[in-house]
Curated annotation (Swiss-Prot):
One of its GO terms (biological process) is L-methionine salvage from methylthioadenosine. InterPro entries: IF-2B-related, IF-M1Pi, IF_2B-like_C, Initiation_fac_2B_a/b/d, M1Pi_N, NagB/RpiA_transferase-like. Pathway: Amino-acid biosynthesis; L-methionine biosynthesis via salvage pathway; L-methionine from S-methyl-5-thio-alpha-D-ribose 1-phosphate: step 1/6. This is Methylthioribose-1-phosphate isomerase. It catalyses: 5-(methylsulfanyl)-alpha-D-ribose 1-phosphate = 5-(methylsulfanyl)-D-ribulose 1-phosphate. Coiled coil: none annotated.
């Protein structure tokens, strides 16, 4: 029953946030959804970096894919006889792309992958870049579909689930990570009810996740972030399913701010907690969450909703974008390599140590 053949991808996988046209990267502008469906055209690597920083494109896998195409765009501005010479000239552009969002490891991973293939490329280095960028996108989509099947298999039929932020097609090459599990679970009739937290301050849950599910014909119920513990106490959800921006060697997981408190509440109420992310999100070089740089964004993002100020002048705000959930609060980490139950350093090493 967990076979991906049971999933109608024509229904559950038709949204695409990135489109490479051959001469530019078209990004579905996620700052304007759900009311305006508009694309941002990026024809330089710096335009891609700005789109990543400004959240026109967001989600750890999606920004890694965007960065790959950003390298392809940067390559147009230089001349080099081989990949190694090109890499030296491209390094400033790669550094600017990497600085756009510091917490998500997929961004650095994608750029390191581009460096590796460039360093070994000959005179055809431009074609090598384009092939590698496309491969990053193709592999992400395949991984998401596989993770969807693996994660759905953990869910008992009739379950309710709660998700946080946006981890669907908009955050990936397609189908999604945590939302991919939910899509697969709905397709297999394992999930009876979906709840989504609004995810302040950017409202990714309210603006993006419930919109995505609506496009698929999936009935989702939006809740205020502050209602999550009460929802768990009610018995309406059996799983919290989230994505990740970085998973450490001991299972500690950085994800959208608010994830940590969901994990604490889930453990208290006997609700299972699942993290879904491709292996590119796993950072075995980072021993624990204490070593993760947590991105801080403009405090002004907390001062209003939808462009309307709701806070008095002169108020200070603290606006971390991510938090770290300890591995011992996570029941399962799902990647395309398999399921790591009760993740700890030994289990993570066994799965990803090579």
């Amino acid at each position: 029953m967990n076979d991906s053949a049971h999933i109608d991808y024509a229904r559950y996988d038709h949204i695409r946030p990135l489109l490479w046209t051959g001469d530019a990267l078209e990004l579905l502008d996620q700052r304007k959804l759900p009311f305006v469906v508009e694309h941002v055209r990026c024809d330089t690597s710096d335009a891609v970096a700005e789109a990543i920083h400004s959240l026109a494109v967001r989600g750890a896998p999606a920004i890694g894919i965007a960065a790959g195409w950003g390298v392809a765009l940067a390559a147009r501005d230089i001349a080099a006889d081989d990949g190694n010479a090109a890499l030296q000239k491209l390094e400033p552009a790669l550094l600017r792309l990497n600085a756009a969002r510091p917490t998500a490891v997929n961004l650095a991973w994608a750029l390191m992958r581009m460096r590796r293939v460039l360093g070994a490329a000959g005179a055809d280095w431009r074609a090598v870049i384009a092939r590698e960028a496309q491969a990053i996108a193709d592999e992400d989509l395949a991984a998401n579909r596989h993770m969807g099947a693996l994660g759905a298999a953990l869910i008992a039929p009739g379950s309710g689930v709660l998700t946080h932020c946006n981890t669907g097609s908009l955050a990936t090459a397609g189908f999604g990570t945590a939302l991919g599990v939910i899509r697969a679970g709905m397709a297999q009739q394992r999930i009876a009810k979906v709840f989504a937290g609004e995810t302040r301050p950017w409202l990714q849950g309210a603006r993006l996740t419930v919109w995505e599910l609506q496009q698929d014909g999936i009935d989702a119920t939006l809740i205020a972030d502050s209602a999550a513990s009460h929802l768990m106490k009610s018995g309406l959800v059996q799983w919290v399913i989230v994505g990740a921006d970085r998973i450490c060697a001991n299972g500690d997981t950085a994800n959208k701010i608010g994830t940590y408190q969901l994990a604490i509440a889930a453990r208290h109420h006997g609700v299972k907690f699942m993290v879904v992310a491709p292996s590119s999100t796993v950072d075995m070089a980072t021993a624990s969450g204490d070593q993760i740089e947590i991105e801080q964004r403009d405090p002004g993002e907390l001062f209003g909703v939808g462009g309307v100020r709701t806070v008095a002048d002169g108020i200070h705000a603290w606006n971390p974008v991510f938090d770290v959930t300890p591995g011992d609060l996570i029941d399962a980490i799902v990647t395309e390599r398999g399921v790591i139950a009760q993740p700890d350093q030994a289990r993570m090493q066994a799965a990803f140590g090579n």
